[in-house]
Amino acid sequence: IPQGAVVCDLGSGQGLTSMFLAKEYGFTVYAADLWSDPEENRKFFDEMGLSRTQIIPVKADAAALPFEKEFFDAVVSTDSYNYFGRDEKYLDEKLLPFVKSGGYIYIAIPGMKKDCHEHLPAELLLSWTPEQLDYMHDAAYWRDMVSRCRGAEVLSVSEMESNEEVWDDWLRQENEYAVGDRKAMEAGGGKYLNFIAIVLRKK
């Protein structure tokens, strides 16, 4: 990603990834999220010493992004793409139009080591319903999904090396979702789960 790039943090939540991208790399970041309050995020960014030109919080639906075409040098999506990107047309129709030619899309999502939706392990059902687990798939599923995209080159789809570290960090959080996930992981559900990294480049 070039220095001074304009980057979309898609599904940004409270904007922690946005802050990292702005502080560590000097990018101009649009923190786009449907469920968080842009004003609350703005207060948080102000408290963290980030200017209003460094991070711009935006309330946005991932399926109807409110930006100019070819606006972004790159898109980063952490722990959210699996909720809206499971439609094979999503990349071509809903996301890539807003990315410049040659721009990168970086995705990191929770997944499964091997899809097991036909016979869900009891350990996983301690924390999640079958409907919730339908948002989690293995690398083969995601490789097939993004490979159907006509407008981007698939550079890599792989299990993240930091898998256990990422899960441990998540489970230490005290928010209600992390607390709810502990039952499954404490029962050994982690042996079925991973984190998946996807890198694409717009043609």
Residue ranges and their predicted role:
Residues 134-150:
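Short alpha-helix
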Residues 89-104:
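A short glycine-rich, Lys/Arg-flanked "PGG" loop and its adjoining helix->strand segment in the class I
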Residues 110-132:
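Short, glycine-/aromatic-enriched active-site segment of Class I SAM-dependent methyltransferases
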Residues 8, 14-64:
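Class I SAM-dependent methyltransferase SAM/SAH-binding core
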Residues 156-203:
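Conserved Class I S-adenosyl-L-methionine
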Residues 74-87:
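A short SAM/SAH-binding and catalytic strip from SAM-dependent methyltransferases
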Residues 63-75:
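A short acidic, Gly/Pro-enriched loop at the edge of an enzyme's catalytic core
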Residues 1-6:
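Short helix-loop-beta connector
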